[in-house]
Amino acid sequence: MTAPILVATLDTRGPAATLGTITRAVRAAEAAGFDAVLIDDRAAAGVQGRFETTTLTAALAAVTEHIGLITAPLPADQAPYHVSRITASLDHLAHGRTGWLASTDTTDPEGRTGELIDVVRGLWDSFDDDAFVHDRADGLYWRLPAVHQLDHQGRHFDVAGPLNVARPPQGHPVVAVTGPALAAAADLVLLDEAADAASVKQQAPHAKILLPLPGPAAELPADSPADGFTVALTGSDDPVLAALAARPGRPDRTAATTLRERLGLARPESRHALTTA
């Protein structure tokens, strides 16, 4: 196993979780070598004073340089167009350092979340990478042939498109899911059980698999079936930060400019580039 991927999960609940304490925790995780942090407000539902996850992600993008920022699921009733617009905008704000936890359900019996992911990915591809030319002399803002309608008609969603945001810096922000059911649609799969790792690798060989860190932070397992670990952080003074920062052979991934590069994930081609090549 190469140097494992490390993703911190951060509790953003209640009055103790101020913007200052959250910022300090994320910056401490960045200094300790974490590859990303999951800005998770799911446990904060109904807690007075909690932060909205996408707003918090945007704020953290302004005060960090290297660490990836994975935003928790948006409300279930959000339309795919709004989800794609918010997540694409966040990726632009963070210069390609974001991810989206599309679902925390371990099953998708109705296929709704799988369809949502497919539609959102399609909307991210509305503009080719070179669509915007900003040519003031010729009065040309974008190349019309580089704009694509989605025209999706499915069981749960009918979405025409196109999205009114340029293609994200990563092509697609990193898509994360929990559990094996949606692994084939994801880039990053968060599992609870190591026993699921082999089957996920078979159905989604392109994806990176993370398991909860099973023991002391200074002893990262070398024989794990996963590509890395999730680590729950309590704050900037969590002892796990010092232990991980001091570990021998700690990789330096600061040269990576996007979260995809940090995780070893390829930048996806646009579906339109693939069909017209």
Curated annotation (Swiss-Prot):
Keyword tRNA-binding listed: no
Pfam families the UniProt entry points to: Bac_luciferase
Self-association state and partner proteins as the record states: Heterodimer of two subunits, SnaA and SnaB.
A GO molecular function held by the record: oxidoreductase activity, acting on paired donors, with incorporation or reduction of molecular oxygen
Taxonomy, superkingdom: Bacteria
Species annotation: Streptomyces pristinaespiralis
Keyword Flavoprotein: yes
Keyword annotations: Flavoprotein, FMN, Monooxygenase, Oxidoreductase
Official protein name in the record: Pristinamycin IIA synthase subunit B
Endpoints of the signal sequence: none
Cofactor(s) demanded: FMN
Function: Catalyzes the oxidation of the proline residue of pristinamycin IIB (PIIB) to pristinamycin IIA (PIIA).
Entry-linked InterPro entries: Diverse_substr_monoxygenases, Luciferase-like_dom, Luciferase-like_sf
Cross-referenced Gene3D superfamilies: Luciferase-like domain
